[in-house]
Amino acid sequence: MFPSDLGLIDANGLIQALNQMGGIGDFNDRDLARFQKALTSTSGYTGYNLEKTVKRFLPAYTVLCNRVARDNAPVGLMAGPQAHYKAQLGYSGFDFGAAMGTAFGANGSDGNPSATDIGPDYKSQSIHGSVQLEAIDFARQFDDPLQQQSLFNLTALMRIEELLVAGGNEFIISTPAPTGSGAGTGTTFHSGTWTVKVTALTEEGTLRNQTGAYVPVVGKAAGETVPGTASIVLGSNQLYLDVKWPVIKGALGYKIYCSAAYSDSTDVYLLDPATELAYKDGGTIHTSFAGQKYVGVNHVRIIAPPAGTQGVPTLDGSANANQFEGYWAWCTKTTMYGVDLSGAGQRVFTDMDGAAFTSEDGGLVEINDALQKLALLYHTAPTAMVGSPQTIRAITNKIVHNNNVSMMLVGNQGGNLQQQNKFIGGIMVGGYTNTFAQHYGMSPLIDIIAHPYIPDGNLMLLSETLPPDTYRNANDGRCFALDVLRPYNYFPLASVDRNVNFDMWFLETLKCMYPTAQAAIAGIRVE
């Protein structure tokens, strides 16, 4: 049985099926009438959109996803896990199989196909649930367990979906480019050859869909590359290893691995940023969460050999298969569109090399540079800046320290003398002024959003809409949209058992129509 509207129970059909059930013991007419009343008239589940209820508990997902336009998927049988989409892709040389994570994605002719048929069954998340019929007792003022179980399932699904939209996969990157060792008077590192490897924490999807080192190996999941290994030859009495590597387009953060003993090129183990790593100038690395093993910078010191025994991820693709893009991927590269936009004059991207933001009289140098390039190259202006809470805190501290924010004095509010002439402690920088957006329909104020799932040291500048000047003689356009398959329920009702089993699945796919309007700053030192 399928509901007539996504996210809603077909109460009449459910009751009709229950009335036709036989052999269910002492489930008498009085119980059935009470069950029917609960479902059809007063239950919070019937006729209620569970998606909105669940999103109240997922603030980060709500803030980001509710800002962009929504394209609702078709209803009915085609809305299930086997739903198919016709995707228009206007670029040639696109590796459909690699991008979609399935061999069946390569439908269509070679060259520049007008469309491809995508069966995104691997993107659907589903949760199985069950409730006991006798537990549904509206007369005693209990919550409908069918509603509660469904809300629980949907919450789990949307937490999965939020991670898929905002990040959560780890891929191995190519060889880092270490600069060697910093001299010291201590004896932390024995003379000899030390091995260092680096992995990248990325969004779901490939690192870059282009020729070169980032092309997926045949037969393996999209996004995998050969692990990067750097050998550092040291003299005696070295205090630390100085290691740097280029910012990996699409990476959110990095994990650093090192050999536990000199001249061991085989066994490398994960380093703890709190005790075994430092910033490039020796400063202590402070992570947002205790036990966080990744860093947001691409230039560090290794100040101690690894004490743990966690090795480098495997290459078999078992943990990375069939993943797809998220917000950050569109800011640093474009995989779904099959074109490398990381070259000069194409991608607005800043590699901080482990440095902190730089202050100037008009704000922060790196942010202003990115805003200027977006206005100059693409005639657009971001409407949102998204980073980790620690990254937003670093922006706030820099702006306040440079006196680029105004203090607010609380006056006499409603005659309350206790509230008169008091300063409010603490500063929240909830927006940033775009100096280059005074006209053409651009937004001069950029909303700042702290997203808990983005690792430290990364800042996205999202253009959610295009001003009329970008395409002259046109209205405002949109850069992002959500293909939405709202919660969908399936109830294979029991004919004998009182236990009702059901499944629920949920799907949202983010689309970016204008990837060049997005900018990113990576490798920022935040404290």
Name the predicted role of every residue range.
Residues 2-42, 47-51, 55, 136-137, ...:
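Sequence/fold signature of self-assembling virion shell proteins
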Residues 37-128:
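Assembly/oligomerization interface modules of large self-assembling protein complexes
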Residues 95-116, 205-221, 263-279, 407-417, ...:
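Acidic Ser/Thr/Pro-rich low-complexity disordered segments
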Residues 146-149, 157:
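Stable alpha-helical elements in mature extracytoplasmic
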Residues 151, 155, 369-372:
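Solvent-exposed, polar/charged alpha-helical surfaces in well-ordered, non-transmembrane soluble domains
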Residues 154-162, 166:
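Sec-exported extracytoplasmic/periplasmic mature domains
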Residues 167-336:
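Disordered, low-complexity "stalk" and linker segments at domain junctions of extracellular
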Residues 168, 379, 383-384:
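Extended amphipathic alpha-helical segments with heptad-repeat/coiled-coil character used for oligomerization
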